Amino acid sequence: HQRVTLNDGHSIPVLGFITYAPDEVIKPGEEMFPTDEHGKSIGVSNFNHKRVXNQVEXHPYLNQSKDIVLVAYSALGSSRDPWKQSPALIALRYQLQRGVVVLAKSFIEREIKVFGFQLSSEDMK
């Protein structure tokens, strides 16, 4: 999302279409973000500061080469034979073994027992 300025002297047309100045994109100034010990990093995209965490879509083939900790939000996905576990648990275990912080939501206890098994290095490929 980009914030833009409206053209000076122009009003918003009746049908809801607006006129804007595309060359005048509003960028957040550095003064918005503290640079002392209270603001070392932020968890929001589209800023120049190094992010601590960023909530994004992740899948097993996603390349994480920028040293950003990935948070797997609601990463639940029914039974895969070798582990006798649901695909949801396999997906959760996969993310945990990759070092991703997983925020799982479930009211079913068996769907969050992710520490009772481990994936092999071959499974992780």
Curated annotation (Swiss-Prot):
Class of enzymatic activity (EC top level): oxidoreductase
Activity modulation notes: Strongly inhibited by sulfhydryl reagents and quercetin, but not by pyrazole, barbital and indomethacine.
Binding site for NADP(+): 9-18, 74-111
Domain of life: Eukaryota
Post-translational modification (record): The N-terminus is blocked.
EC number(s) given by UniProt: 1.1.1.218
Keyword Flavoprotein attached: no
GO cellular component: cytoplasm
Subcellular location(s) per record: Cytoplasm
Function text: Catalyzes the dehydrogenation of morphine to morphinone. Uses both NAD and NADP, but the activity is much greater with NAD than with NADP.
Quaternary structure and interacting proteins, as annotated: Monomer.
Family, as annotated: Belongs to the aldo/keto reductase family.
Protein name (database record): Morphine 6-dehydrogenase
Organism whose genome encodes this protein: Oryctolagus cuniculus
Taxonomic path: Eukaryota, Metazoa, Chordata, Craniata, Vertebrata
